[in-house]
Amino acid sequence: MARVTVEDCLEKVPNRFALVLMVAKRAKQLLKGAEATVSTRSNKYIVSSLREVAMGNVGYQDSLDANEAIRQIEKDLNK
């Protein structure tokens, strides 16, 4: 995959907002040392996260409402 686009990712995620939340959380996991599921020449965690979503390696879980998701992201970012 030469370039990853938002449209590639939206085939796997219900909307752009969910995509942003999911990619941000995954990028933070990669930053903390999680192993990437795709091989990439890029050291950018956001790009790696987007590639993982586009390839279907990272799943979307629709169990949190929007407010709970925002609180969880804020909590994760403050760690």
Curated annotation (Swiss-Prot):
Domain of life: Bacteria
GO BP terms in the entry: DNA-templated transcription
Signal peptide residues on this chain, from the entry's feature table: none
GO CC annotations, alphabetized: DNA-directed RNA polymerase complex
Gene3D superfamilies in UniProt: 3.90.940.10
Pfam families found in the cross-reference section: RNA_pol_Rpb6 (PF01192)
EC number assigned by the record: 2.7.7.6
Top enzyme category: transferase
Coiled coil: none
A GO term for molecular function: DNA-directed RNA polymerase activity
Catalytic activity: RNA(n) + a ribonucleoside 5'-triphosphate = RNA(n+1) + diphosphate
UniProt entry keywords in alphabetical sequence: DNA-directed RNA polymerase, Nucleotidyltransferase, Transcription, Transferase
Subunit and partners: The RNAP catalytic core consists of 2 alpha, 1 beta, 1 beta' and 1 omega subunit. When a sigma factor is associated with the core the holoenzyme is formed, which can initiate transcription.
Similarity comment: family membership: Belongs to the RNA polymerase subunit omega family.
Its job: Promotes RNA polymerase assembly. Latches the N- and C-terminal regions of the beta' subunit thereby facilitating its interaction with the beta and alpha subunits.
Name of the protein: DNA-directed RNA polymerase subunit omega
Species this chain originates from: Bdellovibrio bacteriovorus (strain ATCC 15356 / DSM 50701 / NCIMB 9529 / HD100)
Record lineage: Bacteria, Pseudomonadati, Bdellovibrionota, Bdellovibrionia, Bdellovibrionales
Gene: rpoZ
